[in-house]
Regions:
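Acidic, surface-exposed loops and disordered segments
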Residues: 2-11, 17-195
């Protein structure tokens, strides 16, 4: 399994390098990006292998590359890699599946500035984070934390100030198992020009 994970990491690094290279066609770039989007899946079980500091930085750089309303960039991130804190949060947030994750990234919005579209902006940042994890051979899953009960748990566990509101908790790690993406294409959900 470790060999497969390392192979994914190499493939992810290659993917990111290839997409930024100027010597491949626009069509090839599109194929690489779309393949990564369609390969993304929710991973809820992880090996004990840690996520490197460099990988964490890459994930956060990808998240911060997201678009935001009026370029407000309201996102704030809390990286949680303390095992005791993860275990404590796991007991109170059972859907977050933090029990095997070596780390989690909590995506939050700063409501002290332009806050009208903070959930949209932070959602875009979260999706970028998930796609970067996929490209790097890591696993991750978006778990909601914005409702009153869950946000209170996260706020207390992390000591968040009043102006910082959690959107989601994203456990990240090396997948333990063979997780497959789901084909969610459904043309019946598409309408043109009117309902």
């Amino acid at each position: 399994m470790k060999a497969l994970t390392k192979m994914h990491a190499i493939a992810g690094a290659t993917l990111l390098t290839m997409v930024s290279c100027n010597n491949i066609s626009e069509s090839q770039k599109a194929d690489i990006v779309l393949e990564n989007i369609f390969a993304r899946k929710s991973v809820r079980k992880f090996t004990s292998e840690p996520v490197s500091d460099k990988q964490v930085e890459t994930l956060l750089r990808a998240a911060m590359a997201a678009p935001s309303a009026k370029n407000g960039q309201p996102w704030r991130f809390v990286v949680v890699n303390d095992k005791d804190k993860l275990a404590s949060m796991d007991k109170q947030l059972p859907y977050a599946r933090l029990d095997t994750a070596p780390m989690a990234i909590v995506v939050c919005g700063d409501l002290s500035g332009y806050k009208k579209f903070w959930t949209d902006d932070c959602s875009a940042a979260t999706e970028n984070l998930l796609l970067a994890a996929e490209a790097m051979g890591l696993g991750a899953v978006w778990t909601a934390a914005s409702d009153e009960e869950r946000s209170g748990i996260v706020r207390e566990a992390l000591g968040l100030p009043e102006n910082i509101h959690p959107l989601c908790v994203v456990p990240v790690g090396h997948p333990d198992g063979d997780f497959q993406p789901k084909d969610k294409w459904d043309p019946s959900k598409i309408h043109y020009n009117q309902w």
